[in-house]
Amino acid sequence: MSFPAGIMWRVRRTVVLLHGFTHTGRSWDPVVARLGERYRALAPDIRGHGAAAEARPVSPAECAADVAAAAPESFVLAGYSMGGRLALHVALSHPGRVEALVLVAATPGLADPVEREARAREDAALAEQIEASTIEEFAERWGRNPLFKGQPTEVADAAHADRLRNTTAGLAAALRGLGQGACEPLWGRLGELRMPVVLVVGELPVPRVALAERMAAAIPHADVLVVPATGHAVHLEAPGIVAEAIVQAASAREPAC
Protein backbone atom coordinates (compact mmCIF):
# COMPACT_ATOMS: atom_id res chain seq x y z
CA MET A 1 0.00 0.00 0.00
CA SER A 2 1.38 3.43 -0.92
CA PHE A 3 0.48 6.87 0.37
CA PRO A 4 0.81 10.34 -1.19
CA ALA A 5 4.07 12.14 -0.50
CA GLY A 6 4.10 13.85 2.88
CA ILE A 7 1.36 11.64 4.33
CA MET A 8 2.37 9.49 7.32
CA TRP A 9 0.37 6.45 8.37
CA ARG A 10 0.03 6.18 12.14
CA VAL A 11 -0.52 2.91 13.95
CA ARG A 12 -3.47 3.03 16.32
CA ARG A 13 -2.08 1.87 19.67
CA THR A 14 -3.96 -0.48 21.97
CA VAL A 15 -4.10 0.31 25.67
CA VAL A 16 -5.28 -2.43 28.03
CA LEU A 17 -6.69 -1.07 31.31
CA LEU A 18 -7.13 -3.32 34.36
CA HIS A 19 -9.49 -2.19 37.11
CA GLY A 20 -9.21 -2.53 40.88
CA PHE A 21 -11.08 -4.68 43.41
CA THR A 22 -14.85 -3.98 43.46
CA HIS A 23 -14.64 -2.05 40.17
CA THR A 24 -15.29 -3.09 36.56
CA GLY A 25 -13.77 -2.07 33.26
CA ARG A 26 -16.30 0.78 33.14
CA SER A 27 -14.36 2.54 35.91
CA TRP A 28 -11.77 3.50 33.29
CA ASP A 29 -14.31 5.38 31.14
CA PRO A 30 -13.13 8.88 32.22
CA VAL A 31 -9.53 7.98 31.30
CA VAL A 32 -10.55 6.38 28.01
CA ALA A 33 -12.46 9.53 27.06
CA ARG A 34 -9.23 11.51 27.38
CA LEU A 35 -6.86 9.16 25.56
CA GLY A 36 -7.72 10.44 22.10
CA GLU A 37 -8.29 8.76 18.76
CA ARG A 38 -4.76 7.40 18.45
CA TYR A 39 -5.55 4.82 21.11
CA ARG A 40 -7.87 1.84 21.14
CA ALA A 41 -8.81 1.01 24.73
CA LEU A 42 -9.59 -2.45 26.08
CA ALA A 43 -10.90 -2.44 29.65
CA PRO A 44 -11.99 -6.00 30.45
CA ASP A 45 -13.81 -7.14 33.56
CA ILE A 46 -11.38 -9.21 35.62
CA ARG A 47 -12.55 -12.60 36.88
CA GLY A 48 -14.92 -12.22 39.82
CA HIS A 49 -16.09 -8.80 38.60
CA GLY A 50 -18.81 -7.43 36.34
CA ALA A 51 -19.50 -9.58 33.29
CA ALA A 52 -16.83 -12.04 34.50
CA ALA A 53 -18.34 -12.39 37.99
CA GLU A 54 -18.90 -16.12 37.57
CA ALA A 55 -15.59 -16.96 35.86
CA ARG A 56 -13.53 -19.48 37.85
CA PRO A 57 -10.93 -20.17 39.00
CA VAL A 58 -9.81 -16.71 40.08
CA SER A 59 -6.02 -16.55 40.26
CA PRO A 60 -3.26 -14.25 38.98
CA ALA A 61 -2.21 -16.86 36.41
CA GLU A 62 -5.72 -17.37 35.02
CA CYS A 63 -6.47 -13.64 34.93
CA ALA A 64 -3.14 -12.86 33.26
CA ALA A 65 -3.92 -15.51 30.65
CA ASP A 66 -7.29 -13.86 30.01
CA VAL A 67 -5.57 -10.53 29.37
CA ALA A 68 -2.97 -12.06 27.08
CA ALA A 69 -5.69 -13.82 25.08
CA ALA A 70 -7.80 -10.68 24.66
CA ALA A 71 -4.95 -8.28 23.83
CA PRO A 72 -3.19 -7.85 20.47
CA GLU A 73 0.39 -8.97 19.95
CA SER A 74 1.75 -5.73 21.43
CA PHE A 75 0.01 -3.25 23.70
CA VAL A 76 0.40 -0.61 26.38
CA LEU A 77 -0.73 -1.85 29.78
CA ALA A 78 -2.12 0.06 32.76
CA GLY A 79 -3.61 -1.17 36.02
CA TYR A 80 -5.02 0.28 39.21
CA SER A 81 -4.43 -1.24 42.66
CA MET A 82 -5.37 -4.94 42.35
CA GLY A 83 -5.38 -4.46 38.57
CA GLY A 84 -1.88 -3.01 38.82
CA ARG A 85 -0.67 -6.13 40.61
CA LEU A 86 -2.25 -8.19 37.85
CA ALA A 87 -0.60 -5.94 35.25
CA LEU A 88 2.76 -6.81 36.79
CA HIS A 89 1.97 -10.51 36.33
CA VAL A 90 1.07 -9.89 32.69
CA ALA A 91 4.19 -7.81 32.00
CA LEU A 92 6.47 -10.39 33.61
CA SER A 93 4.77 -13.28 31.80
CA HIS A 94 4.73 -11.55 28.39
CA PRO A 95 7.60 -9.01 28.45
CA GLY A 96 7.94 -8.90 24.67
CA ARG A 97 4.30 -7.92 24.18
CA VAL A 98 3.96 -5.11 26.74
CA GLU A 99 5.29 -1.89 25.19
CA ALA A 100 4.92 0.26 28.30
CA LEU A 101 3.49 -0.20 31.78
CA VAL A 102 1.57 2.29 33.92
CA LEU A 103 0.82 1.27 37.51
CA VAL A 104 -1.68 3.39 39.44
CA ALA A 105 -1.58 3.04 43.24
CA ALA A 106 -0.23 -0.48 42.83
CA THR A 107 2.32 -2.55 44.71
CA PRO A 108 4.05 -5.88 43.98
CA GLY A 109 2.46 -7.41 47.09
CA LEU A 110 3.53 -8.10 50.66
CA ALA A 111 7.14 -9.24 50.94
CA ASP A 112 6.96 -10.16 54.64
CA PRO A 113 5.50 -13.70 54.96
CA VAL A 114 4.16 -12.97 58.44
CA GLU A 115 2.38 -9.86 57.18
CA ARG A 116 1.11 -11.77 54.15
CA GLU A 117 -0.30 -14.57 56.34
CA ALA A 118 -2.06 -12.03 58.56
CA ARG A 119 -3.50 -10.34 55.50
CA ALA A 120 -4.72 -13.70 54.18
CA ARG A 121 -6.65 -14.26 57.40
CA GLU A 122 -8.15 -10.76 57.20
CA ASP A 123 -9.12 -11.28 53.56
CA ALA A 124 -10.72 -14.64 54.35
CA ALA A 125 -12.84 -13.04 57.06
CA LEU A 126 -13.79 -10.16 54.76
CA ALA A 127 -14.74 -12.60 51.99
CA GLU A 128 -17.17 -14.30 54.37
CA GLN A 129 -18.64 -10.90 55.31
CA ILE A 130 -19.08 -10.06 51.63
CA GLU A 131 -20.91 -13.33 51.00
CA ALA A 132 -23.23 -12.63 53.93
CA SER A 133 -24.17 -9.21 52.50
CA THR A 134 -26.14 -7.91 49.57
CA ILE A 135 -24.12 -6.08 46.93
CA GLU A 136 -25.83 -2.83 47.98
CA GLU A 137 -24.80 -3.32 51.61
CA PHE A 138 -21.21 -4.19 50.80
CA ALA A 139 -20.81 -1.40 48.23
CA GLU A 140 -21.99 1.11 50.82
CA ARG A 141 -19.55 -0.19 53.45
CA TRP A 142 -16.61 -0.39 51.06
CA GLY A 143 -17.17 3.17 49.93
CA ARG A 144 -16.50 4.29 53.52
CA ASN A 145 -13.01 2.76 53.44
CA PRO A 146 -10.48 5.36 54.69
CA LEU A 147 -8.56 4.89 51.42
CA PHE A 148 -11.31 6.83 49.66
CA LYS A 149 -11.72 9.59 52.24
CA GLY A 150 -12.04 13.05 50.72
CA GLN A 151 -13.18 11.94 47.26
CA PRO A 152 -15.35 14.51 45.48
CA THR A 153 -19.03 13.57 45.64
CA GLU A 154 -19.30 12.92 41.90
CA VAL A 155 -16.28 10.58 42.03
CA ALA A 156 -17.63 8.68 45.03
CA ASP A 157 -21.05 8.37 43.40
CA ALA A 158 -19.58 7.00 40.17
CA ALA A 159 -17.44 4.51 42.08
CA HIS A 160 -20.48 3.34 44.05
CA ALA A 161 -22.51 2.86 40.87
CA ASP A 162 -19.67 0.81 39.39
CA ARG A 163 -19.49 -1.44 42.47
CA LEU A 164 -23.17 -2.27 42.03
CA ARG A 165 -22.29 -3.93 38.70
CA ASN A 166 -20.70 -6.76 40.72
CA THR A 167 -21.99 -9.69 42.76
CA THR A 168 -21.01 -10.58 46.31
CA ALA A 169 -20.08 -14.13 45.28
CA GLY A 170 -17.79 -12.81 42.57
CA LEU A 171 -16.09 -10.26 44.81
CA ALA A 172 -15.52 -12.85 47.54
CA ALA A 173 -13.89 -15.15 44.99
CA ALA A 174 -11.74 -12.29 43.68
CA LEU A 175 -10.56 -11.40 47.18
CA ARG A 176 -9.65 -15.01 47.93
CA GLY A 177 -7.76 -15.41 44.67
CA LEU A 178 -6.28 -11.98 43.97
CA GLY A 179 -5.92 -10.34 47.39
CA GLN A 180 -2.48 -9.43 48.69
CA GLY A 181 -2.69 -12.25 51.20
CA ALA A 182 -3.22 -14.81 48.44
CA CYS A 183 -0.62 -13.63 45.92
CA GLU A 184 3.09 -14.28 45.96
CA PRO A 185 5.01 -10.97 46.11
CA LEU A 186 6.78 -9.78 42.97
CA TRP A 187 9.35 -7.47 44.57
CA GLY A 188 12.19 -9.79 43.59
CA ARG A 189 11.21 -9.73 39.91
CA LEU A 190 10.85 -5.97 39.36
CA GLY A 191 14.34 -5.83 37.85
CA GLU A 192 13.12 -8.02 34.97
CA LEU A 193 10.89 -5.23 33.64
CA ARG A 194 12.61 -3.71 30.60
CA MET A 195 9.75 -1.63 29.19
CA PRO A 196 9.17 2.02 30.25
CA VAL A 197 7.25 2.04 33.55
CA VAL A 198 5.36 4.92 35.15
CA LEU A 199 4.24 4.62 38.77
CA VAL A 200 1.31 6.95 39.45
CA VAL A 201 0.31 7.65 43.03
CA GLY A 202 -1.77 10.23 44.88
CA GLU A 203 0.08 12.43 47.33
CA LEU A 204 -2.38 11.90 50.20
CA PRO A 205 -1.66 8.29 51.12
CA VAL A 206 1.97 9.09 52.05
CA PRO A 207 3.00 5.44 52.54
CA ARG A 208 1.99 4.79 48.92
CA VAL A 209 4.41 7.46 47.71
CA ALA A 210 7.26 5.80 49.61
CA LEU A 211 6.28 2.41 48.16
CA ALA A 212 6.25 3.82 44.63
CA GLU A 213 9.72 5.28 45.13
CA ARG A 214 10.98 1.96 46.47
CA MET A 215 9.53 0.18 43.44
CA ALA A 216 11.10 2.68 41.04
CA ALA A 217 14.52 2.04 42.57
CA ALA A 218 14.18 -1.64 41.61
CA ILE A 219 12.91 -1.10 38.04
CA PRO A 220 15.46 -0.23 35.31
CA HIS A 221 13.34 2.36 33.46
CA ALA A 222 10.79 3.76 35.90
CA ASP A 223 9.43 7.18 36.76
CA VAL A 224 7.21 8.15 39.69
CA LEU A 225 4.35 10.60 39.16
CA VAL A 226 2.86 11.98 42.39
CA VAL A 227 -0.50 13.61 41.69
CA PRO A 228 -1.28 16.50 44.08
CA ALA A 229 -4.48 16.58 46.12
CA THR A 230 -5.55 13.05 45.20
CA GLY A 231 -5.93 9.84 47.18
CA HIS A 232 -5.75 6.15 46.36
CA ALA A 233 -8.06 6.13 43.31
CA VAL A 234 -6.02 8.58 41.24
CA HIS A 235 -7.55 7.50 37.92
CA LEU A 236 -11.01 8.45 39.21
CA GLU A 237 -9.98 11.75 40.80
CA ALA A 238 -7.58 12.92 38.08
CA PRO A 239 -8.38 10.98 34.88
CA GLY A 240 -6.77 13.58 32.65
CA ILE A 241 -3.42 13.28 34.41
CA VAL A 242 -3.54 9.49 34.31
CA ALA A 243 -4.43 9.55 30.60
CA GLU A 244 -1.46 11.84 29.95
CA ALA A 245 0.81 9.49 31.92
CA ILE A 246 -0.32 6.62 29.69
CA VAL A 247 0.31 8.67 26.54
CA GLN A 248 3.78 9.67 27.74
CA ALA A 249 4.67 6.09 28.63
CA ALA A 250 3.43 4.89 25.24
CA SER A 251 5.41 7.62 23.48
CA ALA A 252 8.60 6.31 25.06
CA ARG A 253 8.16 3.13 23.01
CA GLU A 254 6.70 4.26 19.68
CA PRO A 255 6.09 1.39 17.23
CA ALA A 256 7.68 1.39 13.81
CA CYS A 257 5.41 2.76 11.07
Task: Please give the residue ranges for each predicted region.
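Active-site loop/oxyanion-hole signature of alpha/beta-hydrolase fold enzymes
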Residues: 3, 29-78, 244-247
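Short beta-strand element of the alpha/beta-hydrolase
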Residues: 13-20
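Active-site glycine-rich loops that stabilize anionic/oxyanionic intermediates
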Residues: 20-23, 81
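Short beta-to-alpha linker loops that shape the active-site pocket of alpha/beta-hydrolase fold enzymes
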Residues: 45-50, 107, 230-231
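Gly/Ala-rich beta-loop-alpha elbow adjacent to hydrolase catalytic centers
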Residues: 79, 83, 87
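Flexible "cap/lid" loop of the alpha/beta hydrolase fold
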Residues: 92, 99-131
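Conserved serine/cysteine hydrolase catalytic core
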Residues: 164-217
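Catalytic histidine-centered segment of alpha/beta-hydrolase-like enzymes
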Residues: 230-239
